[in-house]
Regions:
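Short beta-strand-to-turn element immediately C-terminal to the catalytic PLP-Schiff-base lysine
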Residues: 124-126, 166, 192-196, 212-214, ...
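Flexible, small-/acidic-enriched active-site or ligand-binding loops
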Residues: 160, 216-247
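Short Gly/Pro-enriched turn/cap motifs at secondary-structure boundaries
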Residues: 153-156, 180-183, 201-202, 228-235
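Flexible, glycine-rich active-site loops centered on histidine and acidic residues
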Residues: 118-125, 199-200
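A short core secondary-structure module
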Residues: 175-223
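A short, Trp-centered hydrophobic/proline-enriched beta-strand micro-motif
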Residues: 141-149, 193
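Alpha-helical interface subdomain recognition
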Residues: 1-104, 110-113, 125-130, 137, ...
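Long, acidic (Asp/Glu-rich), low-complexity accessory segments flanking structured domains
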Residues: 243-261
Length: 411
């Protein structure tokens, strides 16, 4: 039974079903076979904090299996070898992946090419020579990349970046630091954003450029792995660029207009995190609904107690609203609208209600909700992270009110 009155295109619905089948065929069996490794944060990581070789081999296997099945690059522009599907397909596919994986979600992010880790519209703006060199490996899932924008002093306000691109002959030298660069501990390439015109950057009139840098380039260093929630490792890195040489062909997009390049990925990133929050929130509520019907206390199943079930009903209502908001934003984007307000609303609302849904599911489980075996605690951590990643809720509300004050008040 569907809870949505309007019909989605048949091919979009088929993508959701196909992704669910792929996850059940390729992702969940791998997780089950290696659960002792993947479910234990103490065993996932090598001594330097990166994923162990065993774990990274599984990640690469999933990427390559997805590429072979035709899913990994389905939303990559056709001009660079992808399927050319849009934001709605991206939203439906990712929600299906996370809803299906649920607590066994560790390999889920690699079932589809993430815009910052794999081929994306950003690579439409590199030279033909660079495309020919890097695209085959990225499209196949054998290699990956990362997105170096945030810095120690530049997070929500990316205009504060200090990394410099100093002209040298026909190329540049990059020097600076990056922080919170997801996938950087294992990436083969990094899109590095740097100040190329200090006066223009200071006046907020451009002056920032993007460059594609191999992570094995001289002077490019992963200084450390950023560790979160007490884990022994992580997937975010602190990077140092010390006089890294880049040639003109490594420029991504237009010189001094790097933020235009960055914005190519922002919409997809927010669609992704909206879908991820809804998928994981739905999984958590469904898990809690099953549990409260089985668990008894004081002679009755927990489902008989409104104090336990009403919060689940409220979260289901919120997730339904978030789902509709996400679909609407994706449809607007596919129609050619910028949907700045609508996507900001969808992402900020979805990650908040997704987090609260997991919190309520944990409470319904009592002590069991905190255990590694149930898996809700780690889902909570993921959703707590994406209340900050790809635009904090506060920044998104700032964006929403700016649009409203400019007259974009259609709701």
């Amino acid at each position: 039974m569907t809870s949505i009155a309007f019909d989605l295109p048949a091919d979009i619905l088929a993508i959701g079903d196909a992704m669910q089948a792929f996850v059940k065929r390729e992702v969940l069996p791998r997780h089950a076979q290696h659960a002792a490794l993947l479910d234990d944060p103490r065993r996932r990581y090598a001594p330097d904090g990166r994923y162990s070789n065993e774990v990274y081999a599984l990640i690469r296997e999933v990427r390559m299996a997805s590429a072979k099945a035709g899913f990994f690059n389905m939303c990559v522009p056709a001009s660079i070898g992808g399927g050319g599907l849009g934001h709605l397909a991206y939203f439906v596919a990712w929600q299906s992946v996370y809803h299906t994986c649920g607590a066994h979600h560790f390999l889920a992010p690699y079932a589809i090419g993430h815009w910052a880790f794999a081929a994306s519209a950003v690579l439409e703006h590199v030279t033909d020579a660079v495309r020919k060199r890097i695209l085959p490996e990225l499209l196949s899932g054998r290699q990956s990349m990362c997105f170096g924008l945030s810095e120690p002093g530049a997070g929500s306000d990316a205009s504060m970046i200090k990394t410099r691109a100093t002209q040298e002959g026909d190329g540049w030298r990059l020097s600076g630091r990056k922080l919170w660069t997801s996938n950087s501990p294992h990436a083969d390439y990094c899109i590095v954003f740097a100040v190329s015109d200090a006066h223009a950057a200071a006046a907020h009139k451009g002056g920032i450029s993007a460059f594609l840098v191999p992570t094995d380039a001289a002077g490019f260093e992963l200084e450390s792995v950023v560790k979160l929630f007490g884990h022994a490792g992580g997937d975010e890195g602190a990077l140092v660029l010390d006089n890294v040489r880049v040639e003109r062909e490594q420029l991504v997009g237009t010189l001094h207009q790097g933020f235009a390049t960055a914005l190519l990925g922002v919409s997809l990133g927010r669609v992704y995190n909206t879908a991820r929050a809804i998928g994981l929130g739905r999984f958590a509520i469904e898990l809690a609904l099953s549990y409260v019907q089985q668990r008894e206390a004081f002679g009755h199943p927990l489902a008989d107690y409104q104090g336990i079930t009403f919060p689940l009903a409220e979260s289901a209502t919120q997730l339904h609203a978030a789902h509709l908001m996400g679909l609407n934003a994706a449809l607007l984007l596919d129609r050619g609208e910028r949907a700045i307000k609508e996507l900001s609303m969808a992402k900020s609302y979805a990650v908040e209600v997704g987090l609260e849904a997991v919190n309520r599911a944990m409470q319904a489980h009592g002590g069991m909700g905190l255990t590694n075996e149930v898996g809700l605690a780690e889902i909570w951590q993921i959703l707590r992270i994406i209340n900050i990643a790809d635009g904090t809720n506060e920044i998104l509300r700032r964006t929403i009110v700016q649009r409203l004050l400019k007259g974009d008040t259609d709701l």
